[in-house]
C-alpha cells in the first residue's frame, strides 16, 4: 500500500525523534538502524525510504535536537523573556545532566562527534554557534563586541564540557559530579557578569535526592 505524504512526514518525524533520543543515551556508534526503526515503531524499509544512510539520519536528528533544546532554553519564563541567568540555570542543572535522552546533544555525544562525517560536523558547528550567539545576546552591551564573542565562546565550551564531565563521574562519585556542575555554573556566571548573583544548579543533587529544592532565585540578567 502506498504511503501517503502525511504518513511519510509522520514516519520521518518519528525516526528523527527516536534517533535523537537513542544517540544521546547510547552514542551514535552504539545504536543501529534496527533499534532506531523499532523505537519509532517502523521497519528498516520505512527508515531507508526516508534517509539514504544512518549518517544522513544522524545529521537531521542532531539538527532537530538542537532546535528543541534552544527552544526550551530560551523560552519565556512566566510571561517574561528568558535571561542569561535563566539559560545558565537550565543548561547547568542537575535535571539537564540526569535526563540524557532529552538533553543537549553536544554534551551527550561530545566525545564521539569528531569521528563523524562532515555533514554531521556541520550541523554540530551550527548548533555550537547558536549556543554562542545565545550567550552573546545575554551579555548584551556589557563590553565590546569582540570581547563578548570571546567570553561567549568560553562560556559555551565550559557549559558543554561541564555537563559532560559531570556525567562521566556521576556513577563512581555523585558528590564530585555535583561539585563539577556547581563550580562550572559559578565560574560561567562570573564570566557572564553574574558575580554574587548565582545560586548554582537547579534541581536536586544526585547524592541528596531527599533534600528540598533550594529556595531563592538569581537576579535577572540581560534578556535574550
Where are the regions that the model predicts?
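N-terminal intrinsically disordered/low-complexity leader segments
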Residues: 1-10, 194-224
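Hydrophobic/aromatic-rich alpha-helical bundle segments in the mid-to-C-terminal region
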Residues: 118-126, 130, 139-200, 206, ...
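Helix-turn-helix
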Residues: 14, 18-56, 60
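Solvent-exposed, amphipathic alpha-helical segments
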Residues: 18-26, 72, 76, 158-165
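Amphipathic alpha-helical segments used for helix-helix packing
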Residues: 84-86, 98-125
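Hydrophobic alpha-helical connector segments
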Residues: 60, 71-103, 155
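Residues in soluble alpha-helical coiled-coils and helical-bundle/repeat scaffolds
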Residues: 6, 52-56, 60, 78, ...
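Short, basic, alpha-helical segments at the C-terminal edge of helix-turn-helix-like DNA-binding modules
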Residues: 63-69
Amino acid at each position: 500500500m502506498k504511503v501517503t505524504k502525511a504518513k511519510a512526514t509522520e514516519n520521518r518525524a518519528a525516526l528523527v525523534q527516536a534517533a535523537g533520543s537513542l544517540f544521546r543515551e547510547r552514542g551514535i556508534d552504539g545504536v543501529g538502524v534496527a533499534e532506531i526503526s523499532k523505537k519509532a515503531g517502523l521497519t528498516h524499509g520505512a527508515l531507508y525510504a526516508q534517509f539514504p544512510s544512518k549518517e544522513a539520519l544522524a545529521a537531521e536528528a542532531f539538527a532537530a535536537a538542537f532546535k528543541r533544546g534552544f527552544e526550551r532554553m530560551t523560552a519565556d519564563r512566566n510571561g517574561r523573556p528568558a535571561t542569561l541567568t535563566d539559560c545558565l540555570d537550565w543548561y547547568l542543572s542537575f535535571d539537564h545532566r540526569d535526563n540524557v535522552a532529552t538533553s543537549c546533544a553536544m554534551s551527550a555525544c561530545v566525545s564521539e562527534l569528531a569521528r563523524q562525517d562532515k555533514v554531521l560536523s556541520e550541523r554540530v558547528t551550527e548548533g555550537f554557534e547558536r549556543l554562542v550567539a545565545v550567550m552573546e545576546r545575554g551579555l548584551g552591551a556589557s563590553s565590546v563586541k569582540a570581547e563578548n564573542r570571546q567570553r561567549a565562546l568560553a562560556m559555551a565550551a565550559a557549559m558543554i564540557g561541564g555537563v559532560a564531565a559531570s556525567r562521566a563521574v556521576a556513577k563512581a562519585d555523585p558528590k564530585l559530579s555535583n561539585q563539577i556542575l556547581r563550580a562550572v555554573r559559578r565560574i560561567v556566571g562570573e564570566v557572564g557578569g553574574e558575580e554574587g548573583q548565582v545560586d548554582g544548579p537547579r534541581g536536586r543533587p544526585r547524592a541528596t535526592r531527599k533534600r528540598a529544592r533550594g529556595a531563592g532565585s538569581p537576579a535577572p540578567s540581560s534578556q535574550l
